[in-house]
């Protein structure tokens, strides 16, 4: 049986960009959100083989440490011409300093080396797996994706991560050029475009009630 989120919720991330997006998505539901960083929680090793298992690892670790329901996202970009890379290693490609400019440059260099210059050779998709874990090990898990094409040079300064080089299908602008409302569909969430917002819509249907 599904379980509703009430009261305080730990957001199990130390990524400022991801934290801001999650708080924005949670805002209509009146949830008191506190980050793992604010609580001084350490980051667990992400040893899973896919996005869903890594999200669960982070949520469970935060729930056990904080004794509170904890919400985690594991997301990344999957590039067809790079055999699915960077995938679950998307954050690691940015290194310890979270240098996504360098990570995007690395992707572009690899695409050029493989001759992937035409739009149909530059297909990619973002994946977001969301997990809410309770201290008693109850889990609620969802996953979503958004397909698109990689552009170069990167465009826009909104969002974070690989957003400036990802143009979602059916649009002329990158995520980096879109406002939060355009990217997340806020409000209403039913218009969600991004992978994280689409996953959040699924999670909200089973775990959240608007205030």
Curated annotation (Swiss-Prot):
What does the entry list as the binding residues for Mg(2+)? 45, 74
Q: Does the keyword Ribonucleoprotein apply?
A: no
- Which residues of the sequence carry a binding annotation for substrate? 13-18, 75, 160-163, 183, 195-196
Q: What's in the GO CC field?
A: cytoplasm; cytosol
Looking up InterPro entries in the UniProt record yields:
dITP/XTP_pyrophosphatase, ITPase-like_fam, RdgB/HAM1
An example GO BP is: nucleotide metabolic process
The active site of this protein is located at: 74 (proton acceptor)
- Key word Magnesium present: yes
Q: Which GO terms describe its molecular function?
A: dITP diphosphatase activity; ITP diphosphatase activity; metal ion binding; nucleoside triphosphate diphosphatase activity; nucleotide binding; ribonucleoside triphosphate phosphatase activity; XTP diphosphatase activity
Q: What is its EC number?
A: 3.6.1.66
By what name is this protein known? Answer: dITP/XTP pyrophosphatase
